Amino acid sequence: MIDIIINRLTGQVVIKVSPNEFTFSWRGKSVKIKTYVHLFDDNGYYRILGIGEDFEGSSRCTRVELFSEKLPPNDRILRPELLELFIRFGLQKIIGRRSIMRPTVVFEETHNIAKILSGYQNSVLIEAAYKAGAYSVQIN
């Protein structure tokens, strides 16, 4: 019963996965977000200044590609944490507000990042989605 209520209030957010961009779809609308994050080094603490978009001044930031074989420039930059924030950003952008009810997230085409994540893509995506606020997660 609770699943029916949650589905009516939030529905499913479908995320189509590719190394260069994720496509978030919900209730007939979709948004594409490139899979990189701009970080600014503030005396040893990194601040996220942009997700999936370049902006004026982004050239002075550290750009971290979430699904690149190239390692981030600093070992304190953790891609799983950035992936969680990336998914949270995408969920908020597609739903358009902070949802009272947490959505069900459905990932599609996860095989597109299998090589980069050595076959652990489903586990990585599921964990990131739950941490980003998903009620439940499915892999199609």
Task: Put a short name on every predicted segment.
Residues M1-N140:
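Nucleotide/phosphate-binding catalytic cleft detector across ATP-hydrolyzing
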